[in-house]
Amino acid sequence: MICKKALESAEGDETKALEWLKKQGVEMAESKSQRTTKDGLIEAYIHSGGRVGVILELKSETDFVSKNPLFKEAAHNVAMHIAASSPENIDALLQQPYIKDASVTVGGYLNSIVQKFGEKIELARFERFEI
């Protein structure tokens, strides 16, 4: 239904419709930013060779989302990204091009997860270890 609305608002232009959908997704994520995240999970990732490791806390509003395989996959993907890119802090991480798709930032990737669940999702903290 939302795709139909996007195409109608873009007068059939697929490129403009995609831009409209992205804008709607950002607005959706912003509208959820004031909600409380009281659930979530801890993800631990150890890179092959055992010399780099990451632990992170990815939070959600409900356990329904935090137990979902897509949410768990997102936590794992962000942990792998942190292992590969060594960001200094959360703000720097969210601005980095996402390692699996450089056309989007890590923040944009997390916003796409927000859109799929309709809940606020927040990267609360992370730590990267390297020997």
Describe the residue ranges of each PLM region:
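N-terminal assembly/interaction segments in proteins that build large macromolecular machines
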Residues: 1-131
